[in-house]
Amino acid sequence: MMSWWSSGANTALDEQIEKATSSSLEDIALNLEISDVIRSKTVPPKDAMRSLKKRIGHKNPNTQLSALELTDTCVKNGGQHFLVEIASREFIDNLVSLLKATGPAAVNADVRARILGLIQSWAAVTQGRVELSYIGEVYKTLQHEGFQFPPKVAVATSMIDSSAPPEWTDSDVCMRCRTPFTFTNRKHHCRNCGSCFDQQCSSKSIPLPHLGIMQPVRVDDGCYAKVTDKSRGSGGAGAGAGYDRKSPSLYSSFPHKNRSSSAMQPRSARVDDGFDEDLKKALAMSLEEVKSHSRNYAPASNGVANSGQSKVNGDSSATKTVEEEDDDLKAAIAASLADMEEQKKKHSAVLHEQTHSTEAASASTFVPPKNDYELTPVEAENINLFATLVDRLQTQPPGTILREPQIQELYDSIGTLRPKLARTYGETMSKHDTLLDLHAKLATVVRYYDRMLEERLSKAYGQRNFAGYNMHVPRQTSSPYPSLQGPSAPANVPGESFYTGQPQHDYAEPSRQPSYPPQASGAQQQFHQYAPPHQASQPSEGWQPSHTPAPAAQYAGQPPQQSTESTHSHSSAHNHQNLAAPSAPDQSLPTPTTDPAASYYFNQQQVSALQTPVSVPAEPVQSPYPNLQQQPPAQYQHSPAPQGQAQQQKPPQQPQQPYWQHSASQNTALPTNHQPWPQVPNRQSASYVQEPLPSAPQHAPQKPVVEEALIEL
């Protein structure tokens, strides 16, 4: 191919381009010849692009328009390799500079419009191709800059798809016989496929018009067979044996293409003659087919007579032959029309049967109920039209309604629709009520379902918290302290508290397990693990909900060995009730200063942490409340608290006697002198003395834990 890329070819291309653009009239034949030269890679595509760019920059507007038309033709027929050069910055930027030129260098308005139109059409057909994307970028840039483009013309992307000679591939052996290339066995390339072959496998030469190559070039045996088979197949199928004898070569009907001159020679005016010759041959072929078709429809006697007559009168005149051909052509056309009508009738009958079958099937499968009381679309439209006209009459002068016969007709027709409309309205309201009822039922079911889910969640949460305590359920007794929990009280309790007025818990009734918030679980576990029996847990005077209890490791007191199971049960129940107070500080409860009954329990002060084992005297004193027998508490050993806690403690005040409500048989005197109990290094301090055990059975069976839901349905 390098032998083609010579300076002579470039000079010839420049001459052809100059000749094609020298006139204001477009020479289509010469333009196609130049595009074939570019597509066949006879000249480098970059040189062809530069020649066109040079011609577009001419000062004559007619020359510029002709050069632009030639460039468009080459873009549509020059191949992919030429499109890459057209889409380069060198060519596109030159067009943009012509558009933006001002002053004496400004281009003509027609040239300017043609450049914009070409850029717009090229950007449309090259959309989606990466190697040609610069045209689209320039088109968008010009749009943003405010250039007025002509109306878009729909151009298919196949307009720029054209076949070009393939790129040559290299190989060390022949791609057909696998013979290695040597000094004597030279390498040759096939112009049709671009592969390497030796002299033995690529000795044939044929023109390749589909690649723009009109003179014979070297091809291998495989490509030669493919091209010749295609040409023979097209010729034999179209014209028959007689046509093959008249046109032995593929290009025999195109004499202007079988030339021995250079490729740059322009086409002559015989192009039209060749086209007419091809058209005449095609008409002759169609007439032969019509004759054979008409002979099949003709009677046998007529066929024999015609054959005899053709044998006898074989050398008849040309005019008589033309007349006979016209008659045969008319007969063939009539036969084809009759056949077409017959086929159309058959097709319509089949289509009619199919539609009837589908309609019957649809009618059998689903029959929509027909309601006589429903309004038809026409009736609804009449009602809307009547309402619209009545609204318009509100602004019209009086008497207009008398001059509008359409309103009277609509009024008469709508008056008959009142029963139907009323029935339709009634049916609609009943449907609306039914839907509302269904919606209410659904809402009720959803509410019950949500409540059931909440119950299950509360049970699961309560089981998890109880498992964390790891303790038995104590028997609940009546508490002498004001309740620090919420105002709600358990159901079915006999009496009320003296201080708060709320129902008291039964002594023998198993306690209901309350639900504690997560933040109080740690304090409750430490309290039940280390607190001694019958120790009352009361908040100190400086109580704050954010303070955390002191570590339980500082408290070394252990309960005495003689405490029974019921004593531990009683103390645990009491401690369990009082621990719920810190978890709900925001509840509306009496404060330690406002409630006189609770001031004794909340104003209890802490004493020094360095306490020694103390004992309570057994001398009773008079008390206004029913008394219980008290026994001296067991001795407890306490470890000294930190110095910071000792400084915060205050001297204890004289405590009052707590009120205890038990059975009437247990009324004894309380001790006279009250000594403060050892203070526990916790946020809650002891405020009352230890009470004696009730005379209950020592071995009473403990009731099982009954878990109840927090939310009662």
Swiss-Prot record:
GO terms for molecular function: phosphatidylinositol-3-phosphate binding; ubiquitin binding; zinc ion binding. It is found in: Endosome membrane. Residues 18-150 form the VHS domain. It is a peripheral membrane protein. Residues 230-270, 294-326, 473-597, 612-704 are annotated as: Disordered. SMART domains: FYVE, UIM, VHS. Pfam families: FYVE (PF01363), UIM (PF02809), VHS (PF00790), Vps27_GAT-like (PF21356). Residues 549-578, 640-651 have a biased composition (Low complexity). InterPro entries: ENTH_VHS, HGS/VPS27, UIM_dom, VHS_dom, Vps27_GAT-like, Znf_FYVE, Znf_FYVE-rel, Znf_FYVE_PHD. A zinc finger (FYVE-type) spans 168-228. GO terms for cellular component: endosome membrane; ESCRT-0 complex. One of its GO terms (biological process) is protein transport to vacuole involved in ubiquitin-dependent protein catabolic process via the multivesicular body sorting pathway. It comes from the Eukaryota. Residues 303-320, 475-486, 535-547, 585-597, 624-638, 659-688 have a biased composition (Polar residues). Residues 274-293, 324-343 form the UIM domain. Keywords: Endosome, Membrane, Metal-binding, Repeat, Zinc, Zinc-finger. Component of the ESCRT-0 complex composed of HSE1 and VPS27. Component of the ESCRT-0 complex which is the sorting receptor for ubiquitinated cargo proteins at the multivesicular body (MVB) and recruits ESCRT-I to the MVB outer membrane. The FYVE domain is involved in the binding to phosphatidylinositol 3-phosphate (PtdIns(3)P) which is required for the association to endosomal membranes. Belongs to the VPS27 family. This is Vacuolar protein sorting-associated protein 27.
